[in-house]
Amino acid sequence: MDKRITVVLADANEEFRTALKQALEATGEFDVVGCAADGLAAAQDIAERKPQLLVMDLLLPGLDGFGVLEQAAKDKVQMKTVVVSALYRDQIVSQAMSRGVSFFMPKPCELTSLLDQMRRAVNEGEESEDESQALEREVTAVIHEVGVPAHIKGYQ
């Protein structure tokens, strides 16, 4: 991987934050640019550092996880978000997903599973672009093979 993924962690549980930060840094793929124990600090870290990925719990003192997401949207920070929370109810998961959360994992969770979800969250846009371009090439090849003029498809 040519560039490390920048991450902000936000969790009130210091033990979890520390363990996750160490696991992320050990992979060599991630650069933890912010580590917050409350929602206000998380929102500030996000605004200042503009990470590619946010990993947070919804239960944060000061400003809850939904407030953090709203503040990031106001600050126009575009990032992927993975929520790791004991608050795992259908309505809450649905609300989180509607606010742009990529993945929602229940606590407690295995760090290896969380790392996999984080990688997927960051790479999900890239994969769909590649798939879209591959499909476009395939359709173009079939159209040319059949003999349909290029302008019918909409370009040359």
Label the model's feature ranges.
Residues 3-16, 20-24:
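Conserved acidic segment of CheY-like receiver
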Residues 11, 57-58, 85:
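Active-site residues of response regulator receiver
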Residues 11, 29-37, 45:
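Short hydrophobic/Thr-rich beta-strand motif most characteristic of the beta2 strand and flanking loop
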Residues 38, 64-67:
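Acidic catalytic/metal-coordinating carboxylates
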Residues 44, 66-78:
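Short amphipathic alpha-helix used as the core "switch/output" element in two-component signaling
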Residues 49-55, 60:
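Active-site beta3 strand of CheY-like receiver
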Residues 67, 88-103:
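Alpha4 helix (beta4-alpha4-beta5 surface) of REC/receiver domains from two-component response regulators
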Residues 91, 109-118:
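C-terminal output helix
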